[in-house]
Amino acid sequence: MLVLFVATWSDLGLCKKRPKPGGWNTGGSRYPGQGSPGGNRYPPQGGGGWGQPHGGGWGQPHGGGWGQPHGGGWGQGGGTHNQWHKPSKPKTSMKHMAGAAAAGAVVGGLGGYMLGSAMSRPLIHFGNDYEDRYYRENMYRYPNQVYYRPVDQYSNQNNFVHDCVNITIKQHTVTTTTKGENFTETDVKMMERVVEQMCITQYQKESQAYYQRGSSIVLFSSPPVILLISFLIFLIVG
């Protein structure tokens, strides 16, 4: 009985001390979003939350919360922290696409030809001062990359170089002519010499890579190496 009496008396005391309207969300201390005067407001501005332009609390759709589409917040327009924005996705430029093609990728529409890496145009002497000077002044108009097929499709270097020179000059001439620039007989003569040297360099590079790949295949396919690899796998698994 004594416990029941104490509990009843405590409830009556709390009812008498219950605050009148004007506490939470009225005139007293408030959460963000209440604009009534009086008391301390958190934050001090009337209306919105931290850096919010249209009222509303944390995460509200029109007051802006963390990452909300309307109003402030991290990375949203109008907030106090709008300088912290998400980085935009990098756009793939034509330079990146051209760089990928320059690594020996197969060129579409050329029947399996590949485009070699860019090279420095060789310094060539043509036997007279006029042609040497003409080449130095016009070498930028000539190709610095060659088209070629894999070396295993040719029986020797001469066949590779002959095909490489023909397709490279043809493609470069067609592409340049469409831009309104024509080549003279002197240009074609110099282009043939330049592209020939570049095709020889490309053949040597591709041949070396081809034989290295072949040597690796032969090495790993030999019986002693296969037995050694099998033994190591057995030790690891076992």
UniProtKB/Swiss-Prot annotation:
4 X 8 AA tandem repeats of P-H-G-G-G-W-G-Q, as annotated region: 44-83
Residues cleaved off as propeptide: 216-238
GO biological process terms, semicolon-separated: protein homooligomerization
Keyword Chloroplast assigned: no
Keywords assigned by UniProt, alphabetized: Amyloid, Cell membrane, Copper, Disulfide bond, Glycoprotein, Golgi apparatus, GPI-anchor, Lipoprotein, Membrane, Metal-binding, Prion, Repeat, Signal, Zinc
Entry binding sites for Cu(2+) 2: 54-56
Record-level GO cellular component terms: Golgi apparatus; plasma membrane; side of membrane
Disulfide bridge partners, by residue number: 164-199
Renumbered ranges of Sequence repeats: 44-52, 53-60, 61-68, 69-76
Entry-listed glycosylation sites: 166, 182
Entries under InterPro entries matching the protein: Prion (IPR000817), Prion/Doppel_b-ribbon_dom_sf (IPR036924), Prion/Doppel_prot_b-ribbon_dom (IPR022416), Prion_copper_b_octapeptide (IPR020949), Prion_N (IPR025860)
MF-aspect GO terms: copper ion binding
Amino-acid positions noted as binding Cu(2+) 1 in the UniProt annotation, renumbered to this chain: 47-48
Binding site for Cu(2+) 4: 70-72
Chief place where the protein resides: membrane
Annotated Basic residues bias: 83-93
Annotated region described as Interaction with GRB2, ERI3 and SYN1, given as residue ranges: 16-215
Keyword Lipoprotein: yes
Location(s) in or outside the cell: Cell membrane; Golgi apparatus
Residues given in the record as Cu(2+) 3 binding sites: 62-64
One Pfam family hit: Prion_octapep
Assembly mode: Monomer and homodimer. Has a tendency to aggregate into amyloid fibrils containing a cross-beta spine, formed by a steric zipper of superposed beta-strands. Soluble oligomers may represent an intermediate stage on the path to fibril formation. Copper binding may promote oligomerization. Interacts with GRB2, APP, ERI3/PRNPIP and SYN1. Mislocalized cytosolically exposed PrP interacts with MGRN1; this interaction alters MGRN1 subcellular location and causes lysosomal enlargement. Interacts with KIAA1191.
Function: Its primary physiological function is unclear. Has cytoprotective activity against internal or environmental stresses. May play a role in neuronal development and synaptic plasticity. May be required for neuronal myelin sheath maintenance. May play a role in iron uptake and iron homeostasis. Soluble oligomers are toxic to cultured neuroblastoma cells and induce apoptosis (in vitro). Association with GPC1 (via its heparan sulfate chains) targets PRNP to lipid rafts. Also provides Cu(2+) or Zn(2+) for the ascorbate-mediated GPC1 deaminase degradation of its heparan sulfate side chains.
Stated name of the protein: Major prion protein
Gene name for this UniProt entry: PRNP
